[in-house]
Amino acid sequence: MVPDTACVLLLTLAALGASGQGQSPLGSDLGPQMLRELQETNAALQDVRELLRQQVREITFLKNTVMECDACGMQQSVRTGLPSVRPLLHCAPGFCFPGVACIQTESGARCGPCPAGFTGNGSHCTDVNECNAHPCFPRVRCINTSPGFRCEACPPGYSGPTHQGVGLAFAKANKQVCTDINECETGQHNCVPNSVCINTRGSFQCGPCQPGFVGDQASGCQRRAQRFCPDGSPSECHEHADCVLERDGSRSCVCAVGWAGNGILCGRDTDLDGFPDEKLRCPERQCRKDNCVTVPNSGQEDVDRDGIGDACDPDADGDGVPNEKDNCPLVRNPDQRNTDEDKWGDACDNCRSQKNDDQKDTDQDGRGDACDDDIDGDRIRNQADNCPRVPNSDQKDSDGDGIGDACDNCPQKSNPDQADVDHDFVGDACDSDQDQDGDGHQDSRDNCPTVPNSAQEDSDHDGQGDACDDDDDNDGVPDSRDNCRLVPNPGQEDADRDGVGDVCQDDFDADKVVDKIDVCPENAEVTLTDFRAFQTVVLDPEGDAQIDPNWVVLNQGREIVQTMNSDPGLAVGYTAFNGVDFEGTFHVNTVTDDDYAGFIFGYQDSSSFYVVMWKQMEQTYWQANPFRAVAEPGIQLKAVKSSTGPGEQLRNALWHTGDTESQVRLLWKDPRNVGWKDKKSYRWFLQHRPQVGYIRVRFYEGPELVADSNVVLDTTMRGGRLGVFCFSQENIIWANLRYRCNDTIPEDYETHQLRQA
């Protein structure tokens, strides 16, 4: 290296000398230019020297690495073929990764483990990305460092210390902890005063006004004006509930239409079936969340207990077979076995070996009438039973017509054919149609022939109805001063001196159902709303263009469903009423068709009843014979007094919006001419006081009143039975049905009379 450097130096000097002005001896002073050149040359030599040193270090490192990877010991020389010994490695600077200890062993130098936060063999270590272990709180950014990691601050709505660490094990075992801040407790919310603040994870929500306040988050919550019960006492009911005064003087809270709950708490009830859309913080059954929010199902039936009500569950029994294809939609039967090939699978068929699509079971013994040798369960075989469908173990038959008195519609007059053209349970052979008080009971069978009393109450069973009996309980105390008018108590004991005798305290009719829940507290024969037993009436029995209605009763008789696109028909309960309040929820659970549905009251026979019916769209009936009938959309109240009874005349008269002579009178029509909406729930309220002819019907869509007939006066029918009506419309639901005996004349009756005068 030295000779080469000297040559470079001499050549440089020679070149400089030749280029100068004049010749200068070699030992003379060099000019400034030569000095600069020498300095630059020297700097270049220094750079070369440093590069050489770096190369030496790299070559040494490579050599050590190769030697470290090979097995130590004797190696055969490539050149001589003789065994040779490879020299042992020794610890030296740079042999191991910075911070890693070098250990000298008998077999040579070894490096310790990589530092925390790194991975490798000690000689070479690379950084570990601890962020891959997700040590930070969700939504918090993780920053990888060399070595280690750190988490950014907890997100808004949470609090917690800073978090950082080194190593994968630490990152996995130690997660960042961020605790939710309860803004409702710390005051870090912006809800208006006197409203409900609801804490959520990482945030909060502002709810409705607190009890006792009204308004919202936009307008603020102001203290609600004091509300009072009918007796003048302060009301503790929910703002969407009414305070009701009971017979015994106690107060109850009842949620308003469109709301459900226990009255102290009420929540939205979209489908108007009596159950709130969301669970309320109260223990009563009516505080539970509705398992079908948009389809009324007042019984909340849920066969497979999956939390989805049968009314809105596409596979109600959970057997994997959709309802529309399942031959037992409410009984699990994935095999769909059906021995008798009727509509019902063996799992739910009450006559497995005999077709019986109606599944009728009169005595409710689990065996269908079609295969039951004792249909009524009175221990007399059907063939020998003179009332095979009505229990009558005595088999009494007064008129000897082969029909037992228990089921004979003319028990005192022979009529083996039992013809009853007007469906009033009085056979044609003895039906006089003479009814001077118009209550639906012919004079010969009426226990008060001149006083309307469709219910025919007779508390003392003396043959004289309570309506015309001065001593209903026959205890010797006239009704006018009897403190228990319906229960014998000649001593008139009244310990608390409240005017109600001890024997009828809290249960006026002594039917063992307390007055508070008794729908007819002055009629021991009627206690709860129940349509499980009902009469079917087909209003167009001729022809086969359409089928008869198919009625399904649910919720212990408080819900009815009609499934078929059918001829006009009725499902009528057997209980007759004088004054009555009747309410229910109406819902068409399909987008198919646009025809009539409604309810009836004052039913006396198939030619005499009131009907409230609702059509969706305007339509002319497809059969123009016997006359052209045009239905308009909207709610209609009609009085039916047909001279022909069920048949084509009555059918078309019912379809037609208007009067039809000798058939139907239109008493009121909703002037809005608005039809019902598909899959929308409506709540109706009917008041009927036949003693004065008072009728009023109201309809609600949610909490909003959408139709009101106001006072309508008509005395065509002075009492009768209740039921539901359909005409060519399928999938109708009448849910949360309630009736209540009520003879009290509403205040607006007097107001109406004054206006008329």
UniProtKB/Swiss-Prot annotation:
Residues 527-757 are annotated as: Mediates cell survival and induction of the IAP family of survival proteins. It holds the Pfam family TSP_C. Proteolytically cleaved by metalloproteases ADAMTS4 and ADAMTS1 with ADAMTS4 showing more potent activity. Abundantly expressed in the chondrocyte extracellular matrix, and is also found in bone, tendon, ligament and synovium and blood vessels. Increased amounts are produced during late stages of osteoarthritis in the area adjacent to the main defect. Binds 11-14 calcium ions per subunit. Changing residue 468 to Y: In PSACH; severe form. Keywords: Apoptosis, Calcium, Cell adhesion, Disease variant, Disulfide bond, Dwarfism, EGF-like domain, Extracellular matrix, Glycoprotein, Heparin-binding, Repeat, Secreted, Signal. SUPFAM superfamilies: Assembly domain of cartilage oligomeric matrix protein, Concanavalin A-like lectins/glucanases, EGF/Laminin, Growth factor receptor domain, TSP type-3 repeat. Changing residue 342 to Y: In EDM1; Fairbank type. Residues 298-503 are annotated as: Disordered. A motif (Cell attachment site) lies at residues 367-369. GO terms for cellular component: collagen-containing extracellular matrix; extracellular exosome; extracellular matrix; extracellular region; extracellular space; protein-containing complex. CDD domains: EGF_CA, TSP-5cc. GO terms for molecular function: BMP binding; calcium ion binding; collagen binding; extracellular matrix structural constituent; heparan sulfate proteoglycan binding; heparin binding; integrin binding; protease binding. Its cofactor is Ca(2+). Changing residue 328 to R: In PSACH; mild form. Changing residue 585 to R: In EDM1 and PSACH. Plays a role in the structural integrity of cartilage via its interaction with other extracellular matrix proteins such as the collagens and fibronectin. Can mediate the interaction of chondrocytes with the cartilage extracellular matrix through interaction with cell surface integrin receptors. Could play a role in the pathogenesis of osteoarthritis. Potent suppressor of apoptosis in both primary chondrocytes and transformed cells. Suppresses apoptosis by blocking the activation of caspase-3 and by inducing the IAP family of survival proteins (BIRC3, BIRC2, BIRC5 and XIAP). It is linked to Multiple epiphyseal dysplasia 1: A generalized skeletal dysplasia associated with significant morbidity. Joint pain, joint deformity, waddling gait, and short stature are the main clinical signs and symptoms. Radiological examination of the skeleton shows delayed, irregular mineralization of the epiphyseal ossification centers and of the centers of the carpal and tarsal bones. Multiple epiphyseal dysplasia is broadly categorized into the more severe Fairbank and the milder Ribbing types. This is Cartilage oligomeric matrix protein. It comes from Homo sapiens.
